[in-house]
Amino acid sequence: MSYCLFSAKVFGNAKVFGCAEVFNDAIVFGNAQIFEDAEILESAKLYDNVMISGDVKVFGDAQIFRDVEVSGYAEISGNAQATKKVITFIDIFCYDITITDNHIKIGCQQHLKSKWENFTDKEIIEMDGKMALKFWRLFKPFAESMGLFD
């Protein structure tokens, strides 16, 4: 049985079902679907074609919108924004790479696209040694040619 407690709002074509809970000042609208054991709380906002399932917790001022699906045991909090555009490369030159609207994550290093584009060789070496620099010298021209910094 789903719950909507306190001043939480669910409207539009949004659906909350299963054991899902929406409470505090959370807002769910548009075509958002929340189900299984998901919890949406505090001032979180979910809208458009969002699907949240599993043991996902969305809280704080987090916003999830557009065509995003979140499942499993994820927690999204703070001022986080889940985004539609995500490109992932697995094990490219020994690094996993994820590219979103504003960020690039290479291995365990996540930075704004503009930061990546302007890192010096010294800064790249400080991240993961000479192997990182070798990778960066191959990947950066590829990223530029693909428009990944745009």
List where the protein language model places each region.
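A detector of tandem-repeat and repeat-rich interaction/domain scaffolds
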Residues: 2-83
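Intrinsic low-complexity/IDR segments
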Residues: 1, 6-7, 48, 73, ...
